[in-house]
């Protein structure tokens, strides 16, 4: 799959993976750039953490993945993203 197809799979609750495995989606609602969770499905919809140079930088590739995912989900601060992840863990 290409990146756009993986993002589409994620936003539709399906699993997907790029050929090199750098971007993966899971049926548990997570989107990963390498091993870093960059997107989740919350009760209010999908969100993406701002792991970019304007937020909490991780890598160039991850920044690109965040940008791709922002086409289907809003970007939130990494702090807000971590709070949402914690809330999901309690469900």
Where are these regions (language model features)?
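Terminal leader/tail segments of proteins
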Residues: 1-91
């Amino acid at each position: 799959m290409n990146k756009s197809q993986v993002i589409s799979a994620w936003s539709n609750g399906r699993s997907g993976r790029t050929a090199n495995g750098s971007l993966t989606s899971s049926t548990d609602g997570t989107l990963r750039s390498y091993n870093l969770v960059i997107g989740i499905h919350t009760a209010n919809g999908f969100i993406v953490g701002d792991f970019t140079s304007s937020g909490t930088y991780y890598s160039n590739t991850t920044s690109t993945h965040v940008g791709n995912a922002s086409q289907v989900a809003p970007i939130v601060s990494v702090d807000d993203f971590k709070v949402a992840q914690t809330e999901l863990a309690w469900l």
